[in-house]
Amino acid sequence: MGYTIIWTDKSRKNLEKIPKDTAARIIERVEIIRGDPFLHIDRLAGSSWYKYRVGRYRVILDIKRKTLVIYVIKVGQRKVVYRNLE
């Protein structure tokens, strides 16, 4: 049984600002990690969140192991995605 993926409002808005072909690729790649996300992600330094690399873009994730849920927190280019993370 795989994880459930929940896109936050902020991550959906981030996707709208990205070119459609790139956004589709990001969505497709996030769906791929549903089975076992820990094979593909790295822990975000100084945080309980994780990062997932998709080309020049990064996807910030919050993973709840007990409930098998992946929250997509933020999506953006590497140079700006790490700003203002809370």
Positions of predicted regions on the chain:
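A short, glycine- and basic residue-enriched loop/turn
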Residues: 4, 8, 41-42
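A short, surface-exposed loop/turn module that caps and links secondary-structure elements
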Residues: 28-53
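Short hydrophobic/aromatic-rich motifs at helix boundaries and adjacent loops
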Residues: 1-2, 12-13, 29-33
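Enriched for short, Lys/Arg-rich terminal
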Residues: 2-6, 13, 17-24, 54, ...
